[in-house]
């Protein structure tokens, strides 16, 4: 099986656009630095084409074995494609154990099928950064920050809850001093007038507008009775039994003689109905008054 079986044809449309964008991110200066580093560690020459020299995975496996001895147990020297893919897979497993993050590692086809050389370069740079943290002298990449663990007493941790972090912004030394709870009264006055602070609760600041001397004096709670009269007429206060003329007139009507709602009432007209008379106990009904209840004819 020849290696041409794994070579892809030219890309078109969106695939070509994505491939071009990835190729534009490839850094040739970083490639030269990685070449010098790998050749210096392994002692083997990669070749003119950097990615083609790493494609069989042999140099990559020897390289990780130099950084971490025993990482790859067997390196396949065969030119068959599946042996070369196995070398690349073993290299990926080895650098994962070495400490490179999974999201920084390329896939085997990115190198073997030439689909994403930029990701391969990013993986080698991440490997260089990890090698620096392990004490290797590397001039490529950026050294990862080392952990600086600290242990604090529980009392110190509780004190930290009272501090506002600068990452959350600053209150510019503002505080809640002088603030009252929501809904409580506030003393409002205009400090520009030079007056003292008011002692009563009826002062309204001029900054809030003016009430023109209005107050709530004489006002009653909602639903209570109000005495309504016209002060211009010079009359005294009306009592609660009279209805103001402004509200209309009841024409002398009252509730006299009215009973409680639901009680029985005797309804008759005295012009047409006689006063009912009932026979006494034991008296025959026919011997009673001719205009009694039973014999009114």
Curated annotation (Swiss-Prot):
A GO cellular component annotated for this chain's UniProt record is: actin cytoskeleton
Report any one BP term from Gene Ontology: actin filament organization
Give the Gene3D superfamilies listed for this entry. Answer: Calponin-like domain
One matching Pfam family is CH
Keyword Signal tagged? no
Q: Which GO terms describe its molecular function?
A: actin filament binding; calmodulin binding
Calponin-like repeat intervals = 164-189, 204-229, 243-268
Q: Where is the Calponin-homology (CH) domain?
A: 28-131
User: InterPro entries attached here?
Assistant: Calponin-like, Calponin/LIMCH1, Calponin_repeat, CH_dom, CH_dom_sf, SM22_calponin
Q: Does the keyword DNA-binding apply?
A: no
Q: Which UniProt keywords apply?
A: Actin-binding, Calmodulin-binding, Phosphoprotein, Repeat
Phosphoserine modifications at: 175
Identify residues that carry Phosphothreonine. 170, 180, 184, 259
The role this protein plays is:
Thin filament-associated protein that is implicated in the regulation and modulation of smooth muscle contraction. It is capable of binding to actin, calmodulin and tropomyosin. The interaction of calponin with actin inhibits the actomyosin Mg-ATPase activity.
Identify its protein family. Belongs to the calponin family.
Q: Kindly provide the name given to this protein in its UniProt entry.
A: Calponin-1
Origin species? Bos taurus
């Amino acid at each position: 099986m020849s290696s041409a079986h794994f070579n892809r044809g030219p890309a078109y449309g969106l695939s070509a656009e994505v491939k071009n964008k990835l190729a534009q991110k490839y850094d040739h200066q970083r490639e030269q630095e990685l070449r010098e580093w790998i050749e210096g560690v392994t002692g083997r020459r990669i070749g003119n084409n950097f990615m083609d020299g790493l494609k069989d995975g042999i140099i990559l496996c020897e390289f990780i074995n130099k950084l971490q001895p025993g990482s790859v147990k067997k390196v396949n020297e065969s030119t068959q494609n599946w042996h070369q893919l196995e070398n690349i897979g073993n290299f990926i497993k080895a650098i994962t154990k070495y400490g490179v993050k999974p999201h920084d590692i390329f896939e085997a086809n990115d190198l073997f099928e030439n689909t994403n050389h930029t990701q391969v370069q990013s993986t080698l740079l991440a490997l260089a950064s990890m090698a620096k943290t392990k004490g290797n002298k590397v001039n490529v990449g950026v050294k990862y920050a080392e952990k600086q663990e600290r242990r604090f007493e529980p009392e110190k941790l509780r004190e930290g809850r009272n501090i506002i972090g600068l990452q959350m912004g600053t209150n510019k030394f503002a505080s809640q001093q002088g603030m009252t709870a929501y809904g409580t009264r506030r003393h409002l006055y205009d400090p520009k007038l030079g007056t003292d602070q008011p002692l009563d609760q009826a002062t309204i600041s001029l900054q809030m507008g003016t009430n023109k001397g209005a107050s709530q004096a004489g006002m009653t709670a909602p639903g209570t009775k109000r005495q309504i009269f016209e002060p211009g007429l010079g009359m005294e206060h009306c009592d609660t039994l009279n209805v103001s003329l402004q509200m209309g007139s009841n024409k002398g009507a009252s509730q006299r003689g009215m009973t409680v709602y639901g009680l029985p009432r005797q309804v008759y007209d005295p012009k047409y109905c006689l006063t009912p008379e009932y026979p006494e106990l034991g008296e025959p009904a026919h011997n009673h008054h001719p205009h009694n209840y039973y014999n009114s004819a």
